[in-house]
Swiss-Prot record:
Compartment(s) where it occurs, according to its Swiss-Prot or TrEMBL record: Cytoplasm; Nucleus
InterPro entries cross-referenced by the UniProt entry: Exosome-assoc_fac/DNA_repair (IPR011082), Sas10/Utp3/C1D (IPR007146)
Protein known as: Exosome complex protein C1739.07
Main location class: cytoplasm
């Protein structure tokens, strides 16, 4: 076998091992809700949107590998919707953990910044996951 190919196969094998390690909690859990247990609402939203992205990007890859024009499929709308949610989650993270806040802020500043934090739409995130499972 060509040494270049053997190196590629070796890298692929290592990457697949990494994927297996990452997916092990999914395999062991009985439901996605079990995975979300004990996490903050923001972490739950990130979990749900990551799962949705993984499912939709896998479907997109399936279409591309089989020569199907994915641009006309609903998966493209779903991927765009997921991208929008990712942006919203990133914005929520910035609002929850603002890096510009000084370490020694007063209690008034802390309480006013926490009242401006956006709420994570837990019901919406749950509906997204139910729709894709």
């Amino acid at each position: 076998m060509d040494p270049e190919y053997s190196e590629l196969f070796e890298r692929l094998n290592k990457q697949l091992d990494n994927v297996e390690d990452v997916l092990k909690p999914l395999k062991d859990a009985e439901s996605i809700f079990e995975l979300a247990e004990g996490k903050s609402e923001l972490e739950q939203a990130k979990l749900y949107i990551t799962m949705s992205y993984a499912i939709n990007s896998t479907l997109y890859s399936f279409y591309k590998l089989n020569g199907i024009d994915a641009s006309e499929r609903p998966v493209m709308q779903e991927l765009q919707r997921v991208k929008n949610y990712i942006s919203k989650i990133q914005q929520a993270e910035k609002n929850v953990n603002p890096k510009t806040e000084a370490v020694n802020t007063s209690n008034a500043a802390i309480s006013s910044s926490s009242s401006n934090r956006p709420k994570v739409a837990k019901d919406a995130a749950t509906r997204i996951i139910k729709h894709h499972t």
